């Protein structure tokens, strides 16, 4: 079933990877290394960022610099239309052996559907969270993939019941030990502040997320300074562009906090409490067994006119979804004053025993996921699944 100029060469295949965000770019880079372990002569092309390029991918476009969420993504329709049109022309004459879209369903489901129409195997990595919102898109997903590689334990059963070919590969966050030297806060240069009370701020990796969520985080920190003398805060940035954006907020609030890039795990381990944007970061924090407050600021009208009709899950925080209970406080959608955040943070910072109870529960929650990844990393499982699909052609 080889197409035009498609070699179907099992020893030197061509893989097309698509990552639209920083998190997907990191997953793509790790996956390239795993695929190269299976196919040393493989070629890699696709859509992604600097990390995929460094791993050896010929990057055709880098959308990670302006990635957006929900309604923000619609504003980029022209960009993606042009990119998809170019891919369609290229694949009509030179097809990759396997397409691997990574997360970002708004974009990647379109890429997957295009691949299936051209009879190119599609191995989708990181399942769209249709169990939480927009479950009616399951029909589109079912028609767009040959295999769906899920990263959360319950997803295999959910998507399997919907008729989607699914494998559970484990979550890539657990592929490396949490307490390795690279995540040790004492190893950072310059060192993090030595403060009696320590607050980590994780406002997200997208420009729109930071613009929405960092101001209430800053306001919460400023309010906590009056309750906890000597409190220090450190913000984690995905890259220098996001660090620059975060630092630009500080003069407006008269706040002095450190902003670090490439040190998120160490900052989490350093902190007593983490204020975080919703998303995968909550699982990253849980992996280190750290108490957290989770928020996502959204305009009132966006939630009431759009958001509440899309969301189907009882909880919005990934940690609470996995636990199926209110394990960590979540403030989503958040569109009011910061007093509830300040109250919740004060309660946890003033009561170490409450933080310790959360730490124990997070350890119990994440232990099975860590054990699964210890047996075989997620990237390697995805690589083996991609190889299986290719062998069927």
Each predicted region: which residue ranges?
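Nucleotide-activated sugar donor-binding and catalytic core shared by glycosyltransferases
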Residues: 2-393
């Amino acid at each position: 079933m080889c197409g035009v100029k498609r070699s179907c060469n099992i020893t030197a295949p061509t893989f097309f990877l698509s990552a639209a965000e920083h998190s997907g770019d990191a997953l793509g880079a790790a996956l390239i290394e795993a695929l190269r372990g299976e196919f040393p002569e493989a070629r890699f092309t696709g859509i992604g960022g600097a990390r995929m390029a460094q791993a050896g991918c010929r990057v055709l476009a880098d959308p990670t610099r302006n990635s957006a969420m929900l309604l923000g993504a619609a504003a980029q329709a022209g960009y993606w239309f042009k990119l998809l049109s170019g891919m369609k022309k290229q694949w009509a004459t030179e097809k990759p052996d396997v397409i691997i879209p990574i997360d970002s369903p708004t974009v990647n489901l379109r890429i997957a559907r295009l691949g299936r129409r051209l009879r190119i195997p599609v191995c989708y990595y990181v399942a769209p969270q249709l169990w939480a919102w927009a479950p009616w898109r399951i029909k589109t997903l079912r028609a767009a993939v040959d295999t769906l590689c899920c990263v959360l334990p319950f997803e295999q059963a959910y998507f399997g019941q919907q008729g989607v070919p699914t494998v559970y590969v484990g979550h890539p966050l657990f592929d490396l030990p949490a307490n390795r030297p690279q995540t040790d806060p004492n190893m950072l240069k310059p060192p993090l502040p030595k403060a009696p009370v320590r607050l980590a701020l994780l406002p997200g990796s997208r420009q729109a997320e930071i613009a929405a969520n960092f101001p209430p985080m800053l306001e919460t920190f400023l309010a906590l300074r009056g309750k906890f003398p000597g409190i220090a805060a450190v913000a984690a940035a995905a890259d220098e562009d996001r660090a620059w954006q975060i630092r630009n907020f500080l003069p407006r609030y008269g706040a002095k906090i450190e902003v670090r890039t490439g040190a998120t795990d160490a900052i989490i381990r350093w902190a007593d409490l983490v204020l975080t944007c919703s998303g995968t970061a909550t699982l990253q924090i849980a992996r280190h067994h750290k108490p957290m407050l989770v928020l996502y600021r959204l305009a009132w009208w966006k939630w009431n006119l759009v958001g509440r009709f899309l969301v189907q899950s009882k909880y919005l925080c990934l940690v609470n979804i996995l636990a199926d209970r209110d394990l960590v406080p979540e403030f989503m959608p958040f569109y009011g004053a910061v007093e509830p955040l300040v109250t919740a943070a004060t309660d946890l910072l003033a009561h170490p025993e409450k933080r310790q109870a959360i730490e124990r529960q997070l350890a119990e929650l994440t232990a099975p996921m860590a054990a699964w990844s210890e047996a075989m990393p997620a990237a390697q499982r995805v690589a083996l699944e991609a190889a299986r699909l290719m062998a069927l052609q």
